[in-house]
Amino acid sequence: DTHKSEIAHR
C-alpha cells in the first residue's frame, strides 16, 4: 500500500 508508512509512524 501507500499509507502503510503513514499509519506505521502515526
Curated annotation (Swiss-Prot):
It is found in: Secreted. It comes from the Eukaryota. The modification Phosphoserine is found at residue 5. GO terms for cellular component: extracellular region. Expressed in placenta, specifically the maternal caruncula tissue (MCT) (at protein level). Ca(2+) binds at residue 6. Its main location: secreted. Keywords: Calcium, Lipid-binding, Metal-binding, Phosphoprotein, Secreted, Zinc. GO terms for molecular function: lipid binding; metal ion binding. Belongs to the ALB/AFP/VDB family. Serum albumin, the main protein of plasma, has a good binding capacity for water, Ca(2+), Na(+), K(+), fatty acids, hormones, bilirubin and drugs. Its main function is the regulation of the colloidal osmotic pressure of blood. Major zinc transporter in plasma, typically binds about 80% of all plasma zinc. Major calcium and magnesium transporter in plasma, binds approximately 45% of circulating calcium and magnesium in plasma. Potentially has more than two calcium-binding sites and might additionally bind calcium in a non-specific manner. Interacts with FCGRT; this interaction regulates ALB homeostasis. Interacts with TASOR. In plasma, occurs in a covalently-linked complex with chromophore-bound alpha-1-microglobulin; this interaction does not prevent fatty acid binding to ALB. This is Serum albumin. It comes from Dama dama.
